[in-house]
Amino acid sequence: MLTFLQLTDLHLVAPGGRLYGLDPLERLRLAVDDMARRHGPDSASPAAFVVVTGDLTHNGEPDAYRALAAELRRLPFPAHLMVGNHDSRAGLRAAIPSVPVDARGFVQHAFDTPAGRFILLDSLVPGAPHGDFCATRLEWLADRLVESDGPVFLFLHHPPMEVGLPSSDRLMVRSAGEFWEVLAPHRERLRHMFFGHLHRPVCGSWHGVPFSSIRGLAHQLWLDFGATDHYPGSHEPAAYAVVRAGLDSVVVHTHDFMDPTATFNL
């Protein structure tokens, strides 16, 4: 059984700054503290790594990326970083040169685990809020898929499907059809798809492939099926996902690590 974590939509600003009334860096510190305590090597649920599925910063500021790097160094396990629409590839690479990129400079990479192949994709379109995969990125994905014949776990920032929230659905991956054409021959190997961007806990299936997203680390998107001309923000609790992937199951837990609700023995 492989245990790993997902964190998303940090929206860090320069240290000392606030965003929509919140301090994103302080929330990251609390998340790192909680992940290290609950999922460190001596815990009951040690994690192999955390995948951070994009929007690492809000404005792509160098100081924000440097603050991110400093906090992630406190984790007792590796962090795999991805970019979202609020990010800057150049800014991220300048602050954290070790971030893997492909031969064309896209922030995406693949690695193998006991549970299968993990493929982390770059759906960023500079200056635009929606996601997309150009022909170069789709070709890269196709190559990564044929390198292995085992289970595959996919990670991207933008969802490739509509989820019924008008404010979010217009910002999905524009090339979803072409994306699926690359994935379709490998349908039986696709165990799960993880993404961020929505700032909401959503799960379901797309072309039969299970997917899930979680709330962001910073602000959230309120559940409003009628919001068509604005983004209904909220201060709902931040969360991260705890994923347990085995040979015959994938279980995704959402942990509201900032929820002050009292806990007790039943």
Residue spans of the language-model regions?
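Binuclear metal-dependent phosphoesterase catalytic core
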Residues: 22, 182, 202-266
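Active-site environment of divalent metal-dependent phosphoester hydrolases
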Residues: 13-16, 58-63, 85-93, 126-129, ...
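Active-site neighborhood of phospho(di)ester-bond hydrolases with catalytic His/Asp-centered motifs
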Residues: 6-8, 49-55, 79-85, 122, ...
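His/acidic metal-ligating clusters that form di-metal
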Residues: 31-49, 130-210, 234, 241-242, ...
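Active-site-proximal beta-strand elements of phosphoester/diester hydrolases
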Residues: 2-14, 115-125, 153-157, 209-215, ...
